[in-house]
């Protein structure tokens, strides 16, 4: 009887508390691929090309977005649109060029503490994930005139209107990325991670093992989240024909 009792005590280690909190940083590109880890500053924000200045028109910029510009030239509005079609950014999804482009990375940081029970070859982990914070880096690429002096006032009015409508379309993509519904869903799923069962090896560093397992769980959540955002962006471009049918924007957002 005592031998059996001692044997059971040898294979079951009762509750052990992890000695410290752990902090995780995860950032994802538009394909849901992990691009930065253990970096409290997130991804590096893009900076505008030094040889390209902000357009000499009043556009409604956002403080939470970075802007970059590519040059276009022409003697009238039609030539400017042709230059935009020639020099605009390439969409890797359909290999077509468009007048504007929104690029984004998003992710989060969170802290967690843990306790665990080891039973034979398995470790049963109890988790408390907290302090979940979201971060995103969003950049918008727009065309900018190299020389406004060669254009008539009428062509300038047409061009300025075109760029403003283009910016509004790209800002709708920003709106999709920043929709709080995705943040709320992710927080709910991350916070729901309360228990893990992990294979245990006596030679393992338990803190490293637990942290890696938690990161794997939230990595899956992050990938699924990015895929939903990407799908919404693609659907928005489909419905609005990449901004050519701007009147469909209100229907998409339910306004």
Describe each model-derived feature in a short phrase:
Residues 17, 21-160:
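Short, cationic interaction patches enriched in Lys/Arg with P/S/T/G and frequent prolines
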Residues 8-16:
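Bacterial N-terminal signal peptides
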Residues 171-188:
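Catalytic Zn2+-binding segment of zinc metalloproteases
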Residues 159-174:
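Short alpha-helix carrying the canonical HExxH Zn2+-binding catalytic motif
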Residues 207-255:
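Active-site or metal-binding loop neighborhoods of secreted/extracellular toxin and effector enzymes
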Residues 30, 43, 171, 247-255:
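Post-signal/leader-peptide non-cytosolic segments of secretory proteins
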Residues 192-201:
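RING-type zinc-finger domain of E3 ubiquitin ligases
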Residues 1-8:
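Bacterial N-terminal signal peptides that target proteins for export
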